[in-house]
Swiss-Prot record:
The keyword Ligase does not apply. It comes from Mesocricetus auratus. GO terms for biological process: arachidonate metabolic process; xenobiotic metabolic process. The keyword Metal-binding applies. One of its GO terms (molecular function) is oxidoreductase activity, acting on paired donors, with incorporation or reduction of molecular oxygen, reduced flavin or flavoprotein as one donor, and incorporation of one atom of oxygen. This is Cytochrome P450 2D20. PANTHER family: CYTOCHROME P450 2D26 (PTHR24300:SF109), CYTOCHROME P450 508A4-RELATED (PTHR24300). It is an enzyme of class 1 (oxidoreductase). Pfam families: p450. Heme binds at residue 446. Its main location: endoplasmic reticulum. Its EC number is 1.14.14.-. Belongs to the cytochrome P450 family.
Length: 500
């Protein structure tokens, strides 16, 4: 009897294994084409999940690129993925084939965070009417509230003043600047979204930023990739909450802020910020079920803008200060240009940027070297496309490897070194390079780029105008190697800020 049970069990196991193998082969058959990009041999059911180092994705993709070329394929369980590398191939995909590659693949883990068919937000929204409606609204509303204008510039410089005051309170002692940078940049985006500025000591504010900081990597590691590739696992009770505790807590905090803000909204008054403008659109959209203006999508749109508008800029500024203490000669030259153009009294203005080519070059090189978003948000083909002679089928996930562009050895003189001269010509004039695309390119390029450029210039020049930064005495020289997550952050470091 025991033997019969054992035989039956083994028969079931063998049948299940053969069935899964058959399903796996049938799923892959459409990709067995002569012109499909090459790649590492996938394992049945798992694909290449075990061959990709999700703790250091850029280096893992670099090794595959060296072996298979600028366009290669991966299999994430049953999900086909094509990785695009190098300036020529990335521009072909994002710009030349932009209409056919602007879609987004489903991200099942985000369903747990509130992303639904009627609440797709902006960043991860499928390419179509909802995305167009929300992108148009976000761009126009941010413009209405001062992005690219003098009014917002004054907001940013005032916040930079608060940041400088906080740095002054450190009294030249060693400290890690990332927390204060997060607070200052967050206040800019909070002013746009909620028309509210937080005090740096506000307990709710500090908890919100701490939660967001601790969430880095939750949506980009091995566990996240497995859950996206095999979404049925998300049905396991309690698993999503355990896999993404900080992201869940952050989204809950944003929701609480929205509820409180909504109680103070007066539709008869002009909108105070983007949230008020969105609520007004929700009222207009009643009776139009196809509209993307609803309370659930407001939560997701705010999260998109909050994270994209804060995390990337504050992380870039953290890279900037790290590179200034590692390269004091560059810091001195920036300060000399600030003194010559702006002086020590007047606040920096965006109009100064055109007369400060070296400072502008340094900021661009910080973005290139820091490379905080090396793996772009995935795209998806909406029809068959040809890239670099390869045929990529409809429904394939595309990963534009922006790191391969920002570190392209055929473009940059010193791709692995911090070298501001990458953005200067022989006469010392600023030159923007075609391969500079930290904000991506094409239809899905970052909508917050104008705001980010303003913040980077004004915060950076205000800080270098007021302080000289150095490695604390007795501490080892910090590493310039990043810690991979989304975004890539500097290895934790401390600095001393001494008033000039």
């Amino acid at each position: 009897m025991v033997l019969l049970i054992g035989d039956g069990l083994w028969s079931g196991v063998i049948f299940t294994a053969l069935f899964l193998l058959l399903v796996d082969l049938m799923h892959r058959r459409k990709f067995w084409r002569a012109r499909y990009p090459p790649g590492p041999m996938p394992l049945p059911g798992l694909g290449n999940l075990l061959q990709v180092d999700f703790e250091n994705m850029p280096y893992s993709l670099y090794k595959f690129q060296q072996r298979y070329g600028d366009v290669f394929s991966l299999q994430m369980a049953w999900k086909p993925v094509v990785v695009i590398n190098g300036l020529k191939a990335v521009r072909e995909v994002l710009v030349n084939c932009g209409e056919d590659t602007a879609d987004r693949p489903p991200v099942p883990i985000f369903n747990h965070l509130g992303y639904r068919p009627k609440s797709q937000g902006v960043v991860f929204a499928r390419y179509g009417p909802q995305w167009r409606e929300q992108r148009r609204f976000s761009v126009s509303t941010m413009r209405d509230f001062g992005v690219g204008k003098k009014s917002l510039e004054q907001w940013v410089t005032e916040e930079a003043g608060h940041l400088c005051d906080a740095f002054t309170q450190e009294a030249g002692h060693p400290f890690n600047p990332i927390t204060l940078l997060n607070k200052s940049v967050c206040n800019v985006i909070s002013s746009l979204i909620y028309a509210h500025r937080f005090d740096y000591e506000d307990p709710f504010f500090n908890k919100l930023l701490k939660t967001l900081q601790e969430s880095f990597g939750e949506d980009s590691g091995f566990i996240a990739e497995v859950l996206n590739a095999v979404p049925v696992l998300l049905r396991i009770p309690g698993l999503p909450g355990k896999a993404f505790p900080k992201l869940t807590a952050f989204m809950d905090s944003l929701y609480k802020m929205l509820i409180e803000h909504k109680t103070t909204w007066d539709p008869a008054q002009p909108p105070r910020g983007l949230t008020d403008a969105f609520l007004a659109e929700v009222e207009k959209a009643k009776g139009r079920p196809e509209s993307s203006f609803n309370d659930e999508n407001l939560h997701v749109v705010v999260a998109d803008l909050f994270i994209a508008g804060m995390v990337t800029t504050s992380t870039t500024l953290s890279w900037a200060l790290l590179l200034m203490i590692l390269h004091p000669d560059v810091q001195s030259r920036v300060q000399q240009e600030i003194d010559d153009v702006i002086g020590q009294v007047r606040r920096p203005e965006m109009a100064d940027q055109a007369r400060m080519p070296y400072t502008n070059a340094v900021i661009h090189e910080v973005q290139r070297f820091g490379d905080i978003a090396p793996v772009n948000v995935p795209h998806m083909t909406s029809r068959d496309v040809e890239v670099q002679g390869f045929l990529i089928p409809k429904g394939t996930t595309l990963i534009p490897n922006l790191s391969s562009v920002l570190k392209d050895e055929t473009v940059w003189e010193k791709p692995l070194h911090f070298h501001p001269e990458h953005f200067l010509d022989a006469q010392g004039r600023f030159v923007k390079q075609e391969a500079f695309m930290p904000f991506s390119a094409g239809r899905r390029a970052c909508l917050g780029e104008p705001l980010a450029r303003m913040e980077l210039f004004l915060f950076f020049t205000c800080l270098l105008q007021r302080f000289s930064f150095s490695v604390p005495a007795g501490q080892p020289r910090p590493s310039d190697q990043g810690v991979f997550a989304l975004p890539v952050t500097p290895t934790p470091y401390e600095l001393c800020a001494v008033v000039r």
